[in-house]
Structure formats: C-alpha cells, structure tokens
Amino acid sequence: VNPFDEIEWIISRIKIKNINGDILFDQDIEHPVFWDEMAVRTCAEKYMKSDLGNLPHNGERSVKDVIHRVSFSITKRGKDLGYLDEKGSKILYDELCWLLLHQFAAFNSPVFVNWWLYDVYGFKGNSKTKRWAIKNRDAEVYQQQFEYENAQGAACFITEVEDELIDGENGIYDWVNTVM
C-alpha cells in the first residue's frame, strides 16, 4: 500500500509575514490532516521548492512533494550504487515515506533543502562549483559536473581528525567552556 494513500490529506492556506508585516509566503499547502500548523509552516517555508523554474505546478505545494523528493532520491542513490535491487528500493522508499509522513523520523535541514533537486527535477545549480562524489561501491570518486548532482546532506562537519566531544586539548566541551 502506498503510504501517501493510507492517510487523510487536507489543504491549508499558509501565510508567513516578516517583522514589518510584509507577506513572504502565501500559498495553499496540502498536508496530512494530523500535522500541526507549525510542522506545515516549517515544511512549506523552509523545504518546499518554488523558485527553480521547471517545477510542476510552479513549485512544490504538498508535503507529498517534499517527502517523495527526499525518499525517491535516497532509494535511487542506493539502487544506482548497487546497494538495493528493485524490490529493496520500493520497500525502502515506502518505509522512508511512512516514517516521514507520520513524523517518526526527520532528516536534518540540508537533506530537505538540497536533496535531490537534480534527481527529481533536473535542477543542476552552479556548474562552476567544484565538488567530488562517490561513483560506486568501490568508493571511486569523481568530480561532479553540477552543484546539485550529489547535494550536501549535512550542515556541520568535524574540522579535523583529532576533533572530539570529550574534554581535553581538542575537545569541543573544553572549547565551549573557554568561550562561555
């Protein structure tokens, strides 16, 4: 059973204003009936794409669009790299959709913001950006042609191998104590 077909959907008008009262966002958004207003507003404002020029219906207007984009892209990548067959890909897609729809799991913002505009909508981004990606299961790397070909999925990075959470010379906790 398709996870999107198992639940009831409604459409709500989402209007977001800035401090001065100027309207930043004003759209009808389709979402699960059990999502609260904050979840719908966050998804609409932060993660729905509307400015790429080649999106259906002038942009994403449903939580389905966002969840499909992310879940499809993860399973496509797993299949392309040889980790999943057709059956495993379908199972993982359905499971990811269900978990995200029912809010049992959520990815960090870069996943929802960046993944995978290239795979689903063909959005390439800046071709001058030089990025490297894994080509296959043997961890061969290649230089991407387009910015969103393998989009960034994390916002924070450990700065060096010796970086760690514990106290000590390279510990993050130690650093926090010195700046507070």
Task: Label the model's feature ranges.
Residues 1-180:
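Extended catalytic cores of very large enzyme megasubunits
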